[in-house]
UniProtKB/Swiss-Prot annotation:
This protein binds to 23S rRNA in the presence of protein L20. This is Large ribosomal subunit protein bL21. GO terms for biological process: translation. Part of the 50S ribosomal subunit. Contacts protein L20. The lineage of its organism: Bacteria, Pseudomonadati, Campylobacterota, Epsilonproteobacteria, Nautiliales. One of its GO terms (molecular function) is rRNA binding. One of its GO terms (cellular component) is ribonucleoprotein complex. Disulfide bonds: none annotated.
Length: 102
């Protein structure tokens, strides 16, 4: 059984027991989370919502929050003595999917 959920403008395919990294939600560890924007559910037969499946809820539990690996953005213009170096680290919330109710 799997579901496709929407969170933070992105779509994720999840199953029970999956650990997913979402964009930062600002929640404490061990907090229960409900995702009500369920786009599709498959439990033997596929139910596709218009745009969401009515009555379907995906439940999860926050494991932790953290920061991803650093990504270096380096721009250089040749022969101009011009260069820019920037770094970026993505903040994320790690969630374990506990139940899919459809």
């Amino acid at each position: 059984m799997y579901a496709i959920i929407k969170n933070g403008g992105k779509q994720y395919k999840v199953k029970e027991g999956d650990i997913i990294c979402f964009d930062k939600m600002g929640l404490e560890p061990k907090t229960k989370v409900e995702f009500k924007e369920v786009l599709a559910v498959d439990n033997g037969e596929l139910k596709v919502g218009t745009p969401f499946v009515e009555g379907a809820v995906v439940e999860g539990e926050v494991i932790n929050e953290g920061r991803g690996k650093k990504v270096i953005i380096f721009k250089k213009r040749r022969r101009k003595d011009s260069k820019v170096k920037r770094g970026f680290r993505r903040d994320f919330t790690r969630v374990k999917i506990t139940a899919i109710n459809a």
